[in-house]
Design a protein with these regions (language model features):
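Active-site-adjacent bridging/hinge elements
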Residues: 262, 535-541, 652-663, 708-712, ...
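Non-catalytic protein-protein interaction segments used by genome-maintenance enzymes to assemble
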Residues: 755-823
């Protein structure tokens, strides 16, 4: 047999595999003595089924495999092992970060900005290798001539912008193309395979072979015959409708004269589903898939042109217990395991700031017991929110003194975080990161999780690939590398059910499905937006033999046509409106519709049919909500504060939810100081000021200096933890003289500071229940004549305080009177955050206290008797109420 290479085109459509099987049987009666290469393992199944259709169940099949599988089985040769992706990336990055001119050229503000650039440069170098390596090895001068000819295609303006970047890529390609270049190694292995060929080869692929594969086939044909089966895109192999609408599908342009007099045929397989919204499109797609399954269809396809819609479809199907075998590949960065890794590195970089700590302890891998996880997380959050916001690990630890389990965990975190310092090699960074997870007890849980095990494997692979690199990297560079790897890696989910598959459009050719639905087939997503061709203009790519935008768009259209011709049912779905604006269907379908409508006189049904979706309905009994008014005498609280009683007065249901059921939102943790923190600082410094004056008898003329000293000390400690407190420090410095002047005047009137910041309690008997009233007094003054006065510091506006006292809506001062025996003679709010400090006295105070005592006992006894607690609060009380979502005001 004389070795030959021949090409046999087969038209796209459902008959591709049966025709290939027939031609294979005709060409090789003894199938066991030939080898067939197909693109993927799925195609192996299709070919075997087609052969069985011709030969029956009893036959010896040919050797059917993929090219990658064949290469992997090749015994080691003289080629060195190819450089691993991680090794190539970090070696190139380590070189690029030393080039100051390169940072200036690409406007890189930080070294880490060069890491994505390094990946892009390597990708372009690999693309050049795949297209030009055989020519570069055979005739290097011709390749250089092609390069210079390509640059000549640029306009002078484009050349001025792109010449430096393009030359950089070209030089990098020459520098990277050594014996360990993956493309060079692959080429050598392919040639070794071809030279050792021992049987005829049948090559089957939906696309034209690349330069390396073409060289492989040519070499193989010199030793054993090669037959290439490819898709036939000539005019005679395509339906006339497709030729009329999409003439760029064809390899030749001689279709017009043949088809002008022939009316276009309405495609039998295609129907359209215009959706009103994203949710409507997703629900319709999910209902369509479920309907097909109920009809007994077993091979269903979802083409996710719009990933947002596709995610929603998948969620709806999983809710219906229909598992989707996703071949599109979700980014590993979107998994919760990757989020935990990112949260840990954020915490390390933040050096123990509270918010990153709270984000990290939400990790599902950190606690073996979910109940303990919730309790510990809540206790840590409360500990951080109750006092001043701590800064750094020492401050965090100090907040956990009453939480031994939390403190133990924080100690481990702080110890492990200290190891993330300095510059280290990639394997060292991997070891430190995995060591931290092990110390925190997370490693086992991560490995048991599907995504977690893949994240661990990715890091271990990265360490192995970069073992030979001596360059050291900072924590910021390590984080950037991990983020890049997680973004580039695909999450491979376990596939249990294979009936419904989600496959990208370029994975559809030569595959068989019973029905398919394309979601997101609007003009923005079908065809997919062209990928950026950085560094090389389209004309340069064309001259060098690289894929151009036009070629990629044409290939997308051919993939789409393959689906329409091979699948008996295809539904195309899209949203007709987005944000109130019209959203057009894919231009490919617009062209098809126009072509059909143009021939209305010849074709009765000139419009593509609409897909009817059968959505299941459910009947519910309507029950109008009513205002809640629970009765809960058994839940009468054992303790009550002034704010708690104010809540009862504002809305009984709010009191029921917050004080009796204890349904309170966790306080939000802000890393910036708030007015609450400002109030705590003022309370602290005023307490110190008055105690010092009382103990030392500080003369009046020295008190302003004393206030400045104490204020500086208190705010210096605050600024050390939170530099953003500077604004509050300057604010108090402006108002402090007014307070000192007011305090001196009050002392001259006979009032003396007695004590401050003191807890007071009193126990009442409420219908047989013991209930303790409790509160913390800011300050108590005693007059020379023996009278007592309650002082409460306020940073609120004077007008708001006066309004509060006049309306008697706030019972705080009167409530404090109930805690004192003997009862104070007067009480006042002191507005301290003002240019003029002023005491706003509650009058008549004694009558107010008596009325409050009578009403408080009456209200609490009513609760103990089982009186209702209606949601009767006014709008101002509801505006910021945590129980609003529980009482559902507005729905009744």
């Amino acid at each position: 047999m004389t070795p030959t290479l021949r090409t046999l085109p087969i038209g796209p459509g459902p008959g591709f595999w049966p025709e290939l099987a027939r031609q294979l049987i005709d060409a090789a009666p003894d199938l066991s003595r030939v080898r067939v290469l197909v693109p993927t393992y799925v195609h192996i199944v299709h070919l075997r089924q087609a052969l069985a259709g011709h030969l029956g169940s009893s036959f010896i099949p040919p050797e059917i495999r993929t090219l990658s599988d064949w290469l992997a089985a090749l015994p080691p040769g003289d080629e060195p092992p190819p450089a691993a992706p991680g090794e190539r990336l970090m070696e190139l990055y380590a070189q690029l970060r030393e080039l100051g001119w390169l940072k200036k050229l690409f406007d890189a503000k930080r070294n880490t900005d060069l890491l994505p650039l390094a990946r892009t440069l390597l990708s372009l170098a690999d693309e050049l290798t795949a297209a030009l390596l055989p020519a570069a090895l055979a005739q290097p001068e011709d390749v250089e001539d092609r390069w210079h000819a390509a640059l000549q295609q640029l306009s002078p303006q484009a050349a001025a912008l792109l010449s430096s970047e393009s030359q950089l890529v070209w030089n990098l390609w020459h520098a990277q193309r050594d014996a360990r270049d993956p493309g060079v190694v692959r080429h050598a292995m392919l040639q070794r395979l071809a030279r050792s060929a021992d049987r005829p080869l049948f090559w089957c692929a939906p696309y034209e072979p690349g330069a390396l594969e073409t060289e492989f086939l040519n070499t193989h044909a010199q030793h054993q015959p090669v037959t290439v089966f490819r898709l036939d895109w000539s005019a005679h192999a395509l339906p006339l409708t497709w030729q009329r609408c999409w003439n760029e599908l064809c390899d030749d342009s001689s279709t017009g004269a043949v088809t002008l007099t022939v009316p276009p045929a309405l495609p039998d397989s295609l129907s359209l589903h215009p959706a009103r919204s994203l949710e409507h499109e997703a629900q319709s797609a999910a209902s369509t898939i479920i309907g097909w399954l109920q009809q007994g269809l077993q091979k269903l396809l979802i083409v996710p042109q719009d990933r947002v819609v596709a995610r929603r479809v998948r969620a709806l199907l999983e809710r219906a217990q229909v598992v989707v075998a996703d071949e599109t590949g979700w980014k590993l960065s979107t998994t919760r395991a990757a989020a935990v890794l990112a949260a840990w590195l954020d915490l390390v970089a933040a050096q123990g700031r509270p918010q990153p700590l709270l984000d990290f302890i939400k990790s599902p891998f950190l606690f073996a017991d979910p109940d303990a996880e919730g309790e510990l997380r809540l206790s840590v959050e409360r500990a951080l929110a109750t006092g001043e916001l701590p800064s750094g690990w020492p401050g965090i630890k100090a907040c956990m003194d009453d939480l031994p389990e939390a403190k133990r965990l924080i100690d481990i975190m702080a110890r492990e975080a200290e190891r993330f310092s300095g510059r280290r090699t990639v394997p060292e960074w991997v070891a430190i990161t995995l060591g931290a997870f092990d110390a925190l007890g997370m490693l086992a849980a991560m490995k048991e999780d599907v995504a977690g095990s893949q994240v661990m494997a990715m890091m271990e692979s990265l360490a192995s690939e970069c073992e030979a690199i001596d360059a050291e990297f900072s924590l910021a560079e390590w984080r950037a590398l991990l983020n890049l790897q997680l973004e580039q890696s695909e999450f491979v989910a376990l596939r249990v059910d294979q009936r419904v598959r989600m496959v990208p459009l370029n994975g559809v050719p030569l595959r068989e499905f019973d029905a398919a639905i394309i979601v997101g087939a609007d003009a923005a997503h079908l065809p997919s937006p062209p990928a950026d061709t950085l560094f090389f203009a389209n004309s340069v790519r064309r001259e060098l033999g690289l894929a151009t935008r036009e070629e990629r768009a044409r290939q997308q259209l051919r993939d789409f046509a393959c689906l329409l011709m091979s699948c008996p049912r295809v539904v195309v779905s899209w949203r007709t409106q987005i944000d109130g604006e019209a959203n057009l269907v894919s231009p490919w379908l617009q062209r098809l519709q126009l072509e059909l409508r143009r021939e209305t006189a010849l074709v009765k049904e000139a419009v593509l049919p609409a897909h009817e979706v059968q959505v299941g309905t459910a009947t519910f009994t309507e029950q109008l909500p009513q205002m809640p008014a629970p009765r809960a005498p058994a839940l009468l609280p054992a303790h009550l504060s002034a704010s708690g009683y104010n809540s009862l007065m504002a809305c009984p249901y709010q009191f029921f939810a917050s004080r009796m059921l204890r349904l309170r939102e966790a306080e939000e943790l802000s890393e910036l100081p708030e007015k609450r923190d400002y109030g705590q600082w003022l309370h602290r410094l005023l307490q110190r000021y008055h105690e010092t004056v009382a103990e030392q008898g500080t003369p009046v003329e020295q008190r302003a200096a004393l206030m400045d000293t104490i204020s500086d000390e208190v705010f210096a400690a605050a600024l050390e933890r939170q530099p953003a407190a500077l604004g509050y420090a300057m604010r108090w410095k402006k108002h402090a003289p007014a307070y000192v002047e007011w305090a001196n005047t009050r002392e001259a009137e006979g009032w003396r500071f007695a004590f401050g910041e003191q807890e007071r309690k009193v126990t009442l008997d409420i219908a047989g229940h013991s209930l303790t009233l409790m509160g913390r007094l800011d300050r108590l003054d005693k007059h020379d004549d023996g009278r007592l006065a309650v002082i409460d510091y306020k940073t609120a506006d004077k007008g708001a305080l006066k309004k509060k006292l006049a309306s008697l809506d706030d019972h705080q001062l009167a409530f404090y009177g109930l805690l004192m025996s003997p009862r104070p003679a007067e009480a006042a709010y002191v507005a301290i955050d003002s240019d003029k400090t002023e005491a706003l006295t509650a009058e008549p105070y004694d009558e107010w206290c008596d009325a409050l005592e009578q009403r408080l006992v009456q209200d609490l006894e009513g609760i103990a008797r089982g009186e209702p607690l209606p949601a009767s609060g006014v709008s101002s009380s509801c505006q910021y109420c945590d129980a609003r979502g529980v009482c559902r005001k507005g729905a009744w």
